[in-house]
């Protein structure tokens, strides 16, 4: 048997290829997906009077496509329109998402699109913020900015599952994005990289750098109005599991004890 397939290639980049069956992502047996409409399988409808509707179909979410592909339990901690602020201030509590019974070995955070829309709204006080807005010792002291709330989500899940792994998703590039929004999305990515350095067990999934650009052909094939279609959510799931596989293979020591996360056991001879 040739084990080279599991070894990181010298020039390998994330998403160089899609991994059949999810690859090493299968070792993550419980996963929480924290996000907005694109984490919720949201479809956009349009009636004969040009009235739009937005409908979350979680069975079509990339999280549930992942669950079916890799055989893991995947939670949708998400809803269309979600922001980091709303998640912390009301949504997670109202949905009982901090419940110990819903603890996961891994969390994928896909928030920022709606937060940036709020930052662009002159009537909204939301700012993306700075890494200094994060108190790594006490999230109660985090400032009320996007990155302050985003970090709080991680910190609160770390309270209930201290050794969980966190995967932070950047925003893919779109061909029709204006300069101002592009700059904020770039800043969003920079903040996530900085946060991954500040907090333990965090990894960036840089879809902004490595995923296909959402150009006209991509939108024609994988979008339904302003949101993904069913095939688009399936493609997203395949890209996410392949990216997880890449991260795990490039950080094998970090995942040696993933099977003990959420249990009272560990192996003192190995790193977490």
Task: Indicate where each model-derived feature is located.
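Proline-centered flexible-loop/turn and helix-kink motifs
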Residues: 162-163, 200
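Generic structural signal for well-ordered alpha-helices
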Residues: 150-155, 189
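Structural recognition of the beta-strand scaffold that forms the well-ordered cores
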Residues: 32-34, 74-78, 105-110, 165-170, ...
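Solvent-exposed loop/turn segments at secondary-structure junctions
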Residues: 37-40, 79-85, 113-118, 172-176, ...
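Serine-esterase "nucleophile elbow" of acetyl-processing enzymes
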Residues: 2-78, 95-99, 249, 253
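Conserved SGNH/GDSL esterase-like catalytic core that processes O-acyl groups on lipids
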Residues: 44-131, 135-144, 148, 265
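N-terminal cationic-hydrophobic initiation segments that often serve targeting/anchoring roles
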Residues: 67, 99, 154-159, 196-197
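Catalytic His-Asp segment of secreted/periplasmic serine-dependent ester chemistry enzymes
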Residues: 171-272
